Amino acid sequence: MKKEELKDFCKSIGIDCVGIAGVGPYYDLEKIIKQRLFNGYTTGMEEPIIEKRVNPKETMENVKSIIVCAFPYYIGNFNESNLSKYCYGEDYHIVVKDMLQQICNHLSDNIDNFDYKIFADNGPLVDRYLAYLSGI
């Protein structure tokens, strides 16, 4: 399947921001991660094994490319609250995974032996870096 066909399908299901990232390994990212660790700029939620963050083949040995999607996140204004906005409405992990599953189902229907893994802000790779690489 061509990249434009994939993007057209994604638009048909409401995903306007789609790109394709290469599979690395991402040695420039490794340097950034090590510097952030040295400076203490971590949240504790990151994958602790750096190689898993910079080498997609550690997560999926036969990976050929990475489809990256960005989703709008506006849920309205809540001025009188101490809760983060992501706490309102349906869990975005569920919504995003459902939409990504639609893409994977479409690809599985059109590509023999299509294999995939879905991550929605919960995988070992660095989402923002993949978005950068994919051009979105």
Please provide the spans of the model-predicted regions:
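Auxiliary alpha/beta "docking" domains used to position bulky ligands
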Residues: 1-136
